[in-house]
Curated annotation (Swiss-Prot):
GO terms for cellular component: ribosome. Coiled coil: none annotated. This is Transcription elongation factor Spt5. Belongs to the archaeal Spt5 family. It holds the Pfam family Spt5-NGN. It comes from the Archaea. The keyword Transcription applies. One of its GO terms (biological process) is regulation of DNA-templated transcription elongation. Residues 94-124 form the KOW domain.
C-alpha cells in the first residue's frame, strides 16, 4: 500500500534539523515512515510520507522544533516540483546582471557572457574590472540582479 503525504509545521529555519531528528527517531523505533522531504524553498514545513497521520504524530512527538501535523493529506502533485532538480543557471541569459554570492569573487557584480547548463556553470565578465576577462563560476555562486532589457 502506498503511503500518504502529510505536512508537518516546524520552526522557521529548522526544517533540515527537524527532518534529521525525525529520521533518527524513525530508525531507532522502526516506525513505518517511507520518506521525509525538507525542500529549501519551503520555510516552516517539511513533508512526511507514512501510512497514516497517527504514525507521523508518533514520529514528531517530543521532537524539538516540530509544531504539529497539518490536518489532511498533501496531494503528491503539490510537492512533485520540489523533487525535480533544476540547474542553478536556469532562468539566466547572456547579458543578465548578476552578483557573485560565494567564492573568491564574492560581492562582485558581473555580466553573464555564456551559460553551460550541462555543467551548471556560467561565464561572466566583472563590471568593475579594468580588463574584461571572462571567468567561469558555478551556477549556484551567482544571484540574478536584473534581466537583460530586450528592445522591441
Amino acid at each position: 500500500m502506498a503511503g500518504k503525504i502529510f505536512a508537518v509545521r516546524v520552526t522557521h529555519g529548522q526544517e533540515e534539523t527537524t527532518a534529521k531528528l525525525i529520521y533518527s527517531k524513525v530508525r531507532t523505533y522502526n516506525l513505518p515512515i517511507y520518506a521525509i522531504l525538507a525542500p529549501s524553498r519551503v520555510k516552516g514545513y517539511i513533508f512526511v510520507e507514512a501510512p497514516n497521520k497517527g504514525v507521523v504524530d508518533e514520529a514528531i512527538r517530543g521532537i524539538r522544533h516540530a509544531r504539529g501535523v497539518l490536518p489532511g493529506e498533501v496531494p503528491f502533485k503539490e510537492i512533485e516540483h520540489f523533487l525535480e532538480e533544476k540547474p542553478a543557471v536556469s532562468g539566466l541569459e547572456p547579458g543578465d546582471l548578476v552578483e557573485v554570492i560565494a567564492g573568491p569573487f564574492k560581492g562582485q557584480k558581473a555580466k553573464v557572457v555564456k551559460i553551460d547548463e550541462s555543467k551548471d556553470e556560467v561565464v561572466v565578465q566583472f563590471i568593475d574590472a579594468i580588463v574584461p576577462i571572462p571567468v567561469t563560476i558555478k551556477g549556484d555562486y551567482v544571484r540574478l540582479i536584473s534581466k537583460l532589457q530586450k528592445e522591441e
